[in-house]
Structures are given as C-alpha cells and as structure tokens.
C-alpha cells in the first residue's frame, strides 16, 4: 500500500525560512515534521522544537546531525547556504533520500555537482518557491519574445539587509530566462555594475540592480524600456509564507510522484 503521510526534515530549522516551514508543516494535513536540524554550535540542540518556535505541540528534539536522523524522514527541505546544502545533499544521495533545495548562491561547479547527484536521488531546486514569481517568469518569456529586441531590459531586485548573495538567485534566473528566449549568451549580456564603465548602454545587455535594506521580503521588477514607453512587470512578496507554502507543495509533489532521481524545478510542479 502506498504511503499517504509525508515526513519532512528541515535543515536550517531555526532560520527565518525554517520557522516558516515548520509553521506551514504544522498546518498541512498528512505532512509531519520529524527532524529539525540546526548548525553544530546551536544552543538549542536537544530542546523541543515546538516550545522554541512557539508554533504548537511538536515533540521533536532539535538536532545538529542529519546522519543520525536519516531514517526519520522521507524528504529533506534545505534553506541554508551552499556549503551546508552540498554536504547534506551528499548524505541524502548515499541514503537515497530526496531533497528540496531553496538555497541560492551556488557557483557553476557547485551547480554541476547538484546535477550529477540528481542521477542518484530526486531533487527539486528553485531560487524562489513563490507561485507568483514563477508565473511572472512565464509571463516574461512571452513579453521578451514580443518586445525584447526593441527595448532595453533592466532587472531590479530588493531584499532584507541580512541576505548575503547579490544579485538574488531569482533575478539571475529571470535574466537567464530572458537570454535563453533571445538566444543571448547570459555570461556576456549580464551587467552587474556601471560605476566605472564611463560609456553609454550597449545593445542587448541586461542590467542588474540590487537593494539590501530593512526587512524587505523580496521584490523583483523587470523593466522593458524604449524611447516611447516603459513596461514594468513586478512581483512583491508580502510574507515568507509564500515561499514555505511553495516548498511544501514541491515536497508533496516529489513525494507523490515517487521519483527515484531527477532534477526538477517549480515549472514541473506548476506545469507551466
């Protein structure tokens, strides 16, 4: 008989996204938190995750070891940092445990490693688990097809002052989607700074601007501009709950499909 309940482990359980994920799991039918993993030097190890997060009756002790809890879950959700995620990914690959990756900031070599390990386990990886942002990216593809050749394209993103990578993973994904649609080389068209260039804007370049301030959850705007008009497509995240809802949706999807391996993204989950 097919298993109907989904057991989830969270790496980075007491981070901003981790707490949001725990809250979402607590309120999702047939989905249960069975392991809450934190960094090695956390003072909360062995303390009750329900009491620490004040979410509810979750009688799970906080742990700093993924290996010791490897048999307690079906899927790991990881929103940490590239080094931690890759370490967890290797552990999951050996144990044949599927994983949802929300971490951003991977190098090209690290991304190649993720793709390689997806031959052993099922991986959903997205820079943004918001349904809205993924619909926005889909809309951008059509917009780019129609007006991309005749406009200057700029991507402006804003996040809270604790976010360490810039530009954001989502803005880079947007830029790559635009370049793919236009048959441009992203590595040549992406411009990350102009303060020392002292020259006018070149054709076919995509400019990136990053803002880090306050507690901004996440904002992404794509500007298509020509001499006669400007078109702006914008997505603003009001709450982190949209990311946790999307990540849980991805975990449920991966679990229901029972994939043994493969690298997937939100397009697969949303069928867009």
UniProtKB/Swiss-Prot annotation:
CDD domains: DHDPR_N (cd02274). NADP(+) binds at residue 39. The keyword DNA repair does not apply. It comes from the Bacteria. Its EC number is 1.17.1.8. One of its GO terms (biological process) is lysine biosynthetic process via diaminopimelate. (S)-2,3,4,5-tetrahydrodipicolinate binds at residues 160, 169-170. It catalyses: (S)-2,3,4,5-tetrahydrodipicolinate + NAD(+) + H2O = (2S,4S)-4-hydroxy-2,3,4,5-tetrahydrodipicolinate + NADH + H(+); (S)-2,3,4,5-tetrahydrodipicolinate + NADP(+) + H2O = (2S,4S)-4-hydroxy-2,3,4,5-tetrahydrodipicolinate + NADPH + H(+). The active site is at residues 159, 163. Keywords: Amino-acid biosynthesis, Cytoplasm, Diaminopimelate biosynthesis, Lysine biosynthesis, NAD, NADP, Oxidoreductase. NAD(+) binds at residues 12-17, 102-104, 126-129. Pfam families: DapB_C (PF05173), DapB_N (PF01113). Pathway: Amino-acid biosynthesis; L-lysine biosynthesis via DAP pathway; (S)-tetrahydrodipicolinate from L-aspartate: step 4/4. It is found in: Cytoplasm. PROSITE patterns: DAPB (PS01298). GO terms for cellular component: cytosol. The keyword Nuclease does not apply. Disulfide bonds: none annotated. Belongs to the DapB family. Catalyzes the conversion of 4-hydroxy-tetrahydrodipicolinate (HTPA) to tetrahydrodipicolinate. This is 4-hydroxy-tetrahydrodipicolinate reductase. It comes from Buchnera aphidicola subsp. Baizongia pistaciae (strain Bp). The gene is dapB.
């Amino acid at each position: 008989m097919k298993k109907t309940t989904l057991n989830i482990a969270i790496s980075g359980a007491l981070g901003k996204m981790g707490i949001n994920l725990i809250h979402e799991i607590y309120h999702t039918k047939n989905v249960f938190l069975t392991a809450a993993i934190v960094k090695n030097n956390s003072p909360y190890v062995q303390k009750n995750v329900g009491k620490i997060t004040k979410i509810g009756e979750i009688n799970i002790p906080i742990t700093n070891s993924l290996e010791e809890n490897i048999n307690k879950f079906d899927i790991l959700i990881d929103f940490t940092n590239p080094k931690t995620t890759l370490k967890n990914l290797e552990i999951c690959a050996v144990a044949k445990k599927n994983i949802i990756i929300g971490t951003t900031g991977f190098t090209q070599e690290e991304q190649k490693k993720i793709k390689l390990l997806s031959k052993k386990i099922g991986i959903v990886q997205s820079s943004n688990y918001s349904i809205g942002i993924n619909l926005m990216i889909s809309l951008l593809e059509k917009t780019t097809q129609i007006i991309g050749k005749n406009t200057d394209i700029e991507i402006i993103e804003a996040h809270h002052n604790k976010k360490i990578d810039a530009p954001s993973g989502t803005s880079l994904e947007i830029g790559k989607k635009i370049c793919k649609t236009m048959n441009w080389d992203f590595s040549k068209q992406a411009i990350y700074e102009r303060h020392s260039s002292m020259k006018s804007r070149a054709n076919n370049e995509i400019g990136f601007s990053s803002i880090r301030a306050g507690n901004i959850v996440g904002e992404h705007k794509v500007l298509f501009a020509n001499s006669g008009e400007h078109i702006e497509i914008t997505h603003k995240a009001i709450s982190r709950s949209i990311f946790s809802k999307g990540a849980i949706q991805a975990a449920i999807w991966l679990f229901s499909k029972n994939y043994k391996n493969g690298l997937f993204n939100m397009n697969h989950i949303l069928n867009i």
